[in-house]
Each structure stands twice: as C-alpha cells, then as structure tokens.
Amino acid sequence: MSEVYKQAGVDVEKGYEAVERLKKHVARTHRPEVLGGIGAFAGAFDLSSLQYKEPVLLSGTDGVGTKLKLAIDLDKHDTVGIDLVAMCVNDIIAQGGDPLFFLDYIACGENDPSRIEAIVSGIAEGCEQAGAALIGGETAEMPGMYDPDEYDLAGFVVGIVEKSAMITGKDIKSGDVVIGLSSSGIHSNGYSLVRKLIADVDLNQTYPGLSQTVKDAVMAPTKIYAKSIQALKKEVNLKGISHITGGGFDENIPRMLPDGLGVLIETNSWDIPEVFHFLEEKGNIDNREMYGVFNMGIGMAVVVAEEDVSIALQLLEKVDEQAYVIGKVTEEEGVHFTL
C-alpha cells in the first residue's frame, strides 16, 4: 500500500491485521439470519424466517462516555466493548425489543491491532450476552484528530418486537409495583464525576468500605438485561421498563410513566453496592443527589401489576437475576424516595 499514506499516519497494513484478528470474535456472534461475512460493503440480515405478524424494528445508538478515558489511562480495553453493547441494547429492550444485530465504530489516533482486538472481543462478548449478531463495523485511523493512544467508540443496535407487544407504559396505573434489577456497579454513566472524585486515588489499592480495588470497582462492565427481560416477557405483562442510565432515577423512571403518575422508591429495599457509598463519601455528596446521577445498584426497573410480582421474581431468580421490589406507582408526579 502507499508509503505516502503511511507517512501521513495511516498504516493500512495494520488495518488488515486488525481485521484478521477480529474474524474469530465476530464468528462467536453468528446467527443463521446473517447473510455474507466480513468485507462486504453492508451487513445483511434476513428477517423472513422470524415470522412476525406485524414486526416493528427498534434501533438504538450510544457510546461509553468518559469511562473510556479511564480505560485508556489504565490500558484496559477488554471490557469497554461490553459497555458499548449494553448501553445500546438495554435501551431497545426497554420497549420490548429483542436484539437482532449490532454494528460498531472505533475512531483512533493510531491503529494498534492488539488494542482493537481487545475492544472488539468485548463487543463480541456483549453481543453474545444480548443474542445479537455483530454484522459490521468501522475502524477509522485518524491521526491529528486523536492522540496515538486515544480512541472513541460508538455502537448501533437493531432489534425487533411484535407491534402489539411494544412496551410503552400506557397501561401503568397507580398501585402497580416497581421491581428493580440489580446493576453490576456504576455501569457507564456519571464518569465525568467519577473521574473527578477519584483523581487523587491510587486505583490499584483498596480503601475502607471497598472489598476490591478502585480500578476493579469503576471498570466493572455494564450488565446486559436482554435475557432476563425475555424470560419475563414470556409469562408476565410488563407494563413499563426503565433503563437507569444518565440522570439516574430522576431522569429515567419518568420516561416510562404516563402523565400524572410518579413512583415512590423505597431505598432500603435493596443492597446498594459499596462503590456508591465510597463515591458519596469521597465527594461529600448529598445522598438524595446520588439518585439523580447514578443507578445506585438498580440498572433496570420494570413495572408490573401487584398480582404479577411473585411470578416475576420467581422467573428472574430462575435466570440468576437478582431483583427486588423497590417501590410503587403513585398519583404524585415525579420520583420520590424514602431515604
């Protein structure tokens, strides 16, 4: 390939090497509906065998935010791909979608094949957890736009749902019950604040109140809830689902509620992961404010009728999903807490 292009900072040979390294990871995510392989101009997915009567496609796109800055600083790239898939997939399953396929975009200052492979191995792991095929992607080497060690990620997912089975929240009423599904930690939101709070901390050390290193606590990959929600949908009428992301409870719970309704959250009904206590103390943050920034141990909330609570909890236990009854729907708008 052109030596002139290489002198400009774009090493095409390294790009070819990266593609070869990725093939085995992409293969792990294969579904029979995928047509073709790596190298085509477009990824192709055959919907005809899925046998939906009124199929609705759901799409979502997202990134990992400034959690990537920590990954770069720590030279830990194998789990941010899971975060990327989770942030996209958890959004579409909140409306009842089943993930079909995923695409990624990696922009970097320098194409390091081993680093790209680590990132994509995480993306493939996330796709496996979600049941989505990784059918395409782009790695853009952009010298001058990014420093050699810098990169950014974006993901895009497409899912499907029967039109009549879309989860919109329209049937939620006062007295319905909110069930919280446990998070794996901070997930991928609030990291500009997290990085500020731990700026003077040795990330390889443990601290009072933390049973793991700060690095392990803040880099825990985001949980993907696809299989848990799929298990629930088969037997329970899920009235609403909220993915607790940026803005915590305050921003995300109302997104699933009809106008005129709110929720009362019982904050003593689940075990709050120790990393949140650590951050709260480190920054001297008001406890109530924490719920407006972080997930506080609840990564997804679902609303069911009171008579469905028992079966919902049983189904979640069968798929090893830790869940709690965390509150009720009320006629007072907004999100309220018993702190």
UniProtKB/Swiss-Prot annotation:
Q: Is Transferase given among the entry's keywords?
A: no
Q: Which SUPFAM superfamilies match?
A: PurM C-terminal domain-like, PurM N-terminal domain-like
Give its localization.
Cytoplasm
Catalytic reactions on record: 2-formamido-N(1)-(5-O-phospho-beta-D-ribosyl)acetamidine + ATP = 5-amino-1-(5-phospho-beta-D-ribosyl)imidazole + ADP + phosphate + H(+)
Q: Which UniProt keywords apply?
A: ATP-binding, Cytoplasm, Ligase, Nucleotide-binding, Purine biosynthesis
Pathway the protein takes part in: Purine metabolism; IMP biosynthesis via de novo pathway; 5-amino-1-(5-phospho-D-ribosyl)imidazole from N(2)-formyl-N(1)-(5-phospho-D-ribosyl)glycinamide: step 2/2
**InterPro entries in the cross-refs:** PurM-like_C_dom, PurM-like_C_sf, PurM-like_N, PurM-like_N_sf, PurM_cligase
**Can you cite a GO biological process for this protein?**
'de novo' IMP biosynthetic process
Q: Name one GO molecular function term.
A: phosphoribosylformylglycinamidine cyclo-ligase activity
- Give a single Pfam family match: AIRS_C
Any Gene Ontology CC annotation: cytosol
EC id: 6.3.3.1
Which NCBIfam families does its entry note?
Answer: purM
The UniProt entry's sequence similarity note says: Belongs to the AIR synthase family.
Protein name in the entry? Phosphoribosylformylglycinamidine cyclo-ligase
Q: Which organism is it from?
A: Oceanobacillus iheyensis (strain DSM 14371 / CIP 107618 / JCM 11309 / KCTC 3954 / HTE831)
Q: What is the lineage of its organism?
A: Bacteria, Bacillati, Bacillota, Bacilli, Bacillales
